[in-house]
Amino acid sequence: MTTSTSQQELFQFLEDRFACAQACTECARACALRASMVDPDGAEEQELLRRKGIMCAEVCDATCRVLSEESHLDEAGIRVQLEWCRSVCLECAQVLDRHPGAEAAAKACRECAQACTDFIDTLH
């Protein structure tokens, strides 16, 4: 492997990592906003939406921090974080699908899950 090839791979890795962190940030923002719009004393389905939205926002925020900061996690630890984020995002998207007006947040969740999948695929 030449130096330029390894540098190109490093640049691509960093770009993919940043894209995943950015998708996590967008999802966290969308879910936090959607959760804040739900009546905390609402029906059981509203409470489920609020809890899933808050959980998704927190997991996405934590994942973004892992990806954007100098982390002491090894590759296996990063993979576990990404898989957890992907799972939580997909669960949240399913709940959001049942609520009119939550389409943008559901889309952000799915995009984040896909970004996590894509980045996992770059890990060895």
Question: At which residue positions do the language-model features occur?
Answer:
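Amphipathic alpha-helical hairpins
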Residues: 1-124
